[in-house]
Amino acid sequence: MKRSFLKITATLLIASMAMSIAACSSNGGGSHSLSNNNKTGGSRSESRSGDKISSDDPWFDSNLLKVDIPVDGSRPLEYTYPRLAGVDDKYIVVLTSGYYKMPTGNDVDWNNFNYNDYAINVLSVLDRNSKDIVNSIDLTKDLPKNGYIDSASYTDGKITTRCTTYDDATYSMSTTETDIDPISGNVLDKRDLGNDEEDNSSIERTFKVGEYKIDTSVNWDNNDNAYYVLYITDPNGDRDKVKLKETGVNIYDIPLILSVGNDKAIIPARTENDTKYYELDLKNGSVDPANEKEYNWLDFDSIYNSFTAPDGTIYFTTSIGISKIDLKNKRTEEIFNYSWCGVNRSIISYLELVECSDDGFVLAGENYAYNPYQNSSVSDFIIVEFNKASKNPHAGKKILEMYSAYGSVNEEIGDAIIQFNENSKDYFIEVTDRYSNDSNYDYSNINSEDDWENLSNKINAEMSNALAMDIMNGEGPDILLNTSDLGQLNNTNYLVDLSPYIGNLDSGKYFTNVLEEAKVDGNLYQFPVCYTIEGIHTDAKYAGASGVGFTTKEYEKFLNETLNGTDVIPAGQAIYFTKLFNNMSEKFIVDGKADFSSAEFEQLAEYVKDNVQLNSKSWDEMYNYDDVVTDVSYAVGTTVFKGDYSYSEDKAVFCTTYGISNYFSNMVQYQGTNTILGIPSTDGRGPRIAPYFSIAVSSQAENVDACGEFVKLLLSDDVQKSLALSDNFVLSREAFREAGKVAVEYYNGEGGDYMVAYDPKTGMPVDNSRLTFSEKNIDDMEKIIDSCSGMNSSDASINLILIEEMQPYFLGQKDLKNVATVAQDRVQKVLDERG
């Protein structure tokens, strides 16, 4: 990021942010808390943009090994799930669970069916040095009919398994622990844990604290409050049970346990609102509150899994790499960023630490290769060894910082980053998550669509402010991944127009309308690498005169006649209005000027006042099957209201469609539906796109042209095809149609067995609901994409103003002209102060 300080504009921007945050509740914490969090958890707080990589900067050579899972290759598999049981200096032990494909049909005697005839429970013991499998132990052969393997752990040279069995006669569960020698497979010890509910709970994590081993399990009391049970094994093998429980407090997670010497340990426990700290006496099992001030400098929300080295150093993984804890100096130190190697970060970011030091480490775990068009859930187990290189192969290059929330990057984007870094002579992309801290927000009281939208607006407003301020001060990232929902940034002060790097594409080869609709005031700030479709999935015959959407009058008719008066858009008036406003925002804000005096603004407001419920239903009410049915299709977040009994639930659904599979599944669930229409508007416009993966480039980037080269890379045929075959809507028509044909073939075959409609009243599958798909359905989906009329990139700060100012009009307390004038003035001030 260029250090060009635009002082006057930055000063005005700070004033604008103060106004935006004032419109929010005090729940947040301001943009400052987002960009400069005082807690440390491994995430870097300062940009490295523009820094030149030196030869002695960290770089790690890697070796990736895929472990062959010992299953019967002659039997078709339903799924496998491998996971790490434990590791020491001799062996790595992996537990693989799963099932072979079971029979189907009415001729199966399910009452006497033994599921364990198809179960997979195998322990693989690998030599620590050679990585060869030296022993496989089949746990299924000794399982009782109603038993299953709950967990397995490997510590102190022995494997400990937990088997839980259900008793048909007493309707009770009992658990047995078994110690097994890893090489001979012989049983060393067996313990009946009885039918105590706590002792039957799954072991969640195992920690090594000095000479002690601590197993943790989460439980719930009669009031549904979560608490933890700790099983402490001392150096002599004696075991003690300790409860970590506090009245009225839900303890949801223990990410790590800190050894502080003298047989004492500190337990950080995540609750619904914050982190509590407890001191555990390992000798006598007593637990007391710890001094939080001694440990609250640690950001436990960013800690994923941990490893305690033989010297007592605690290393832990974060969303962007590996850090270690320095208790003495109360800080953490990043020793590895997932960018500092040649392995795709989307693979290694989900693995566990097997061992770690400053000079090398081992990650291992499940690698689930997602393929939406294959009927298989078989996972690989991989081991990746990293060793610090003698010199950095990218020395001399300058760093381009890519911001991604929580450091999340999918496989295709990850591959593109690696390709760019290998081919660029002058620049190196490094991913950070400096603005991902939303731990200040309380989600426990969210119980409706309105609640969720209000909180999302507040979070997005503060995220936008934090990014905008740092960009203007020359301290922000160069490339921004997936920030299309931060509409405030769509301004030449913050982002560059990417149109020159895309060029003039052929509309016959690309969905150029998607790029046009993504523009704001003629500029392409957010490049939609792939995208979703937002709208109302229904039958094309219900469309208004435009054929792609509804005017407010047409939707009112559709609502009252077809939907029997119950809207499928589950929002209250204020939130509903912001949806309609953002769908037509180019009518109300043009070139930084707000105008809410138009007939279009009045029409939307009057429609909402006359036809929309004041507040959205609570989720408690929605999930009451006497009142509402939640859609069971693949569409995320879709809801269908039952309304009166005569209302047909298969008429329409308001949803976000993520790909061809999602489109097909909605066709099946809502038999006869084949299109996605726009939400109510004044001109009957079509549905909107919402970027699923988007790229933006800062106006203050270290080198805009270098960032533009990365954007070009994402439009390449290989990337577009790979994204399309991962069930995403892409810009390339050829890639879209090629993936569509693969989807048609799959869902007309074995994939269709899992794509059936469900009766919303009973939740049971509907007979004969399977559909036969064809190339015509691909044509229909292509027409839907062509009909899209805008991009969802709302400005959260403006949303918050509209929610506050329009409410008195909807309640009948003020006239529309009055509230529109006030809202317009407030919005204009925000726009002016942004520059």
Predicted regions and their residues:
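C-terminal capping/gating helix-and-loop segments adjacent to ligand/active sites or protein-protein/ligand interfaces
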Residues: 689, 752-827
